[in-house]
């Protein structure tokens, strides 16, 4: 009976801890896919002195199982799809891109006192909030398009731009 009680107690504690993970609420942006509810968060990576980390200014990680677990990107995911490559970096600004799409440069900087990712699409500069990939399921999943969501820097209006794969 004691063993059953202890097992039940440990299970309850571990379930409670799983829901108590601390996922930062402010991200540079998130990347979602149509395949499931897991998504990749991209957060600013600062050194202890408050300056951008020169080797890895933006850090990506998975948020899994409807926000109950965090997961590291695998080597393959970093190299082929969700990894971040640095184009240029200064003390308080970096230009990066995702390994899956080199043409979309993301300028990471402080804007109105907050760290943000700024992209330029179709002549509009916008604060990046989210990317969403519509996937076609098959033996080898394929991306049909990526929607990029953000806010126009000049007008403040919400924008969505689509990149066909």
What are the residue ranges of the model-derived segments?
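Short amphipathic beta-strand and strand-loop transition segments with alternating hydrophobic
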Residues: 28-33, 84-86, 133-137
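Ser/Thr- (and often Asn-) enriched beta-sheet segments in non-cytosolic proteins
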Residues: 27-30, 43-45, 63, 88, ...
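Mature extracytoplasmic domains of secretory-pathway proteins
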Residues: 56-125
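Amphipathic, non-transmembrane alpha-helical stretches in extra-cytosolic proteins
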Residues: 38, 76-84, 89-93, 140, ...
């Amino acid at each position: 009976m004691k063993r059953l009680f202890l097992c039940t107690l440990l299970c309850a504690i571990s379930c409670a801890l799983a829901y108590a993970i601390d996922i930062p609420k402010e991200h540079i942006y998130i990347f979602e896919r149509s395949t499931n509810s897991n998504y990749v968060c991209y957060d600013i990576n600062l050194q202890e002195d408050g300056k951008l980390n020169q080797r890895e200014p933006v850090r990506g990680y998975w948020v899994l199982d409807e926000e109950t677990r965090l997961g590291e990107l695998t080597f393959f995911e970093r190299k082929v799809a969700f990894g971040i490559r640095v184009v240029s970096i200064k003390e308080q600004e970096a230009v990066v891109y995702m390994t899956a799409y080199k043409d979309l440069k993301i300028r990471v900087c402080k804007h109105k006192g907050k760290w943000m990712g700024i992209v330029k699409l179709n002549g509009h500069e916008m604060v990046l909030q989210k990317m969403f990939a519509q996937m076609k399921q098959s033996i080898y999943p394929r991306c049909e398009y990526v929607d990029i969501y953000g806010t126009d820097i000049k007008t403040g209006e919400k924008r969505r731009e689509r990149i066909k794969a």
